[in-house]
Amino acid sequence: MGRSESQMDITDINTPKPKKKQRWTPLEISLSVLVLLLTVIAVTMIALYATYDDGICKSSDCIKSAARLIQNMDATAEPCTDFFKYACGGWLKRNVIPETSSRYSNFDILRDELEVILKDVLQEPKTEDIVAVQKAKTLYRSCVNETAIDSRGGQPLLKLLPDVYGWPVATQNWEQTYGTSWSAEKSIAQLNSNYGKKVLINFFVGTDDKNSMNHIIHIDQPRLGLPSRDYYECTGIYKEACTAYVDFMIAVAKLIRQEEGLPIDENQISVEMNKVMELEKEIANATTKSEDRNDPMLLYNKMTLAQIQNNFSLEINGKPFSWSNFTNEIMSTVNINIPNEEDVVVYAPEYLIKLKPILTKYFPRDFQNLFSWRFIMDLVSSLSRTYKDSRNAFRKALYGTTSESATWRRCANYVNGNMENAVGRLYVEAAFAGESKHVVEDLIAQIREVFIQTLDDLTWMDAETKKKAEEKALAIKERIGYPDDIVSNDNKLNNEYLELNYKEDEYFENIIQNLKFSQSKQLKKLREKVDKDEWITGAAIVNAFYSSGRNQIVFPAGILQPPFFSAQQSNSLNYGGIGMVIGHEITHGFDDNGRNFNKDGDLVDWWTQQSANNFKEQSQCMVYQYGNFSWDLAGGQHLNGINTLGENIADNGGIGQAYRAYQNYVKKNGEEKLLPGIDLNHKQLFFLNFAQVWCGTYRPEYAVNSIKTDVHSPGNFRIIGSLQNSVEFSEAFQCPKNSYMNPEKKCRVW
């Protein structure tokens, strides 16, 4: 039998025997040792590199922050010559103002992004939505329902006009229909009480400045159809706006007459609307300039209703104007009777005196044409496309925009403005990181402490006033993120909007409902105490606020995001961002307006005469500094150093306090790791992030508008003005003395 294959020998009998193993040569041994050593060194180096701390932060958040800062800046610019160009040059090259925008800035980009979130949360109904949220979503859907809006033309407005004495220019036989029953008191009161529209006389219920727990009636000068009284010069840079304004009136009057089936006499319409412009121009000239209305002590004139009748006896259409009838016509809508002994605060006595001779020159038809027009112009954008388009040239003249914002953007903002707590709930649930609240609370505590410590450095303020200032700073109440109730208390939120009932196909009626609801709510407050725990803003807002009557600072959820704040970004950026904003809002309690209110929010003079005089002297430095800035986009006009003083004081105080708070942080916690790819230390990064918040630009038309209407300086001057006054900035960037960013004369109030 042969052998099994499994047992075959594995070595062939013919395979030669192996040779005896040879030893390694000294060279081979040396090379092997060398390779081993190199391998060990390489592994060690890799291990060391992986754990080596080179002082550079390599986290994804640091990389993102560095990329954002680098992208926005122009490193080739000289920081000591023009820090705006240095900080924002890259941003300006990359960004073009959208056709729908009058200006564009980092602030506006954040607002655009917030609007996207609002759109997402408002457009999708959910079965679990509480009633208040359902109403917000219904209101939004009615607003974006352009098919329904366009199909109705101007009919919703035409149905409403008889409730406000009609619009004479667009009414056949107005004198016969309305003229006999018309009275100025009733006409002005109806627009005010039902729709919150204040024409000729601004009557409103608000907090009593001298007793901030109570509400009181106020009488003030009205807002105007054009942005400011300056526009009514109607020459030079204002000529186009005046022409577009009258053309806007004429176009709407023709549309209404056409829709009513009335004949159109273009010459007659033009004559009537030019008369409206003439009347409004006289009213504008009677108003007091904004720079003369900055002292709340001088604005506050308390008197009884009977005294108002004696002091400001007006006459319209040959009849004495009854202040009592006018007041009660408004307040009767909320079932409140106003006796002649009722106290009223008059903010504009000079206006009322100047108004008297104007009123005798015009007829009821002229007044009603103006009153109804001022109401109609607000409602045109709620009507069909034909009506909306009538506003195009006017919008271009005031804002420089050639296109409307997307419908969904306008609607998201409208719903947010009218149902801020319902929308705030949706925003918070979708986008707000709750842990931010505690970090910001700590920042507020730090910056408040710095403000109080800084009082010791002030040589212009005496000890008595410093003590009162410290008490006020300690009494400031903060509100961060959102009111807890909007998320946790469904019943309270539902009850807030209980009276509102919207229909998806009746957007115009929904708007009217909101106007009535809002005005009724405000008028009813006259006999109620002020709720100082109430938030003065919604959560879905990219902004921050100070209330002098409440001595309260508010930082809504919408602003607690980069570049202002992130729990993950470097602290230098947080202090330069939200830290500066916190300091800014605290300082508002001590600016040219806020300093007149005490720790309880009452208009009380708590300053010694010497300290008050010194404050005005210190402030005057900033009035001159900012008033000397010439803005090319506004035709070379100079900024108004008086109107912008409060904001400029707050900017300067805020940047100084935030920087000192950051220095304290570094002393306590040590230096932070540097950001990758950007050759700046954290002192420099603090100022860079502060500046980049204000990167932006304006359309020339809106620059002309805002230089007269905005109490803030334009972004570039907010950067330059405050940093020119900062010794710490010049030290951080080693700016030579008398360079543009480091002038010898520096202004400081706080």
Swiss-Prot record:
Disulfide bonds join 57-62, 80-735, 88-695, 143-411, 234-242, 621-747. GO terms for cellular component: axon; brush border; cytoplasm; dendrite; neuron projection terminus; plasma membrane; synapse; synaptic vesicle. Residues 52-750 are extracellular. It is found in: Cell membrane. Pfam families: Peptidase_M13 (PF01431), Peptidase_M13_N (PF05649). Keywords: Cell membrane, Disulfide bond, Glycoprotein, Hydrolase, Lipoprotein, Membrane, Metal-binding, Metalloprotease, Myristate, Phosphoprotein, Protease, Signal-anchor, Transmembrane, Transmembrane helix, Zinc. The modification Phosphoserine is found at residues 4, 6. A lipid is attached at residue 2 (N-myristoyl glycine). Inhibited by mixanpril, an orally-active drug used for the treatment of hypertension. It is an enzyme of class 3 (hydrolase). InterPro entries: MetalloPept_cat_dom_sf, Peptidase_M13, Peptidase_M13_C, Peptidase_M13_dom_2, Peptidase_M13_N. Its cofactor is Zn(2+). It catalyses: Preferential cleavage of polypeptides between hydrophobic residues, particularly with Phe or Tyr at P1'; substance P + H2O = substance P(1-9) + L-Leu-L-Met-NH2; substance P + H2O = substance P(1-7) + L-Phe-Gly-L-Leu-L-Met-NH2; neurotensin + H2O = neurotensin(1-11) + L-isoleucyl-L-leucine. Myristoylation is a determinant of membrane targeting. One of its GO terms (molecular function) is metalloendopeptidase activity. It is a single-pass type II membrane protein. Glycans are attached at residues 145, 285, 311, 325, 628. Residues 2-28 are cytoplasmic. This is Neprilysin. It comes from Oryctolagus cuniculus.
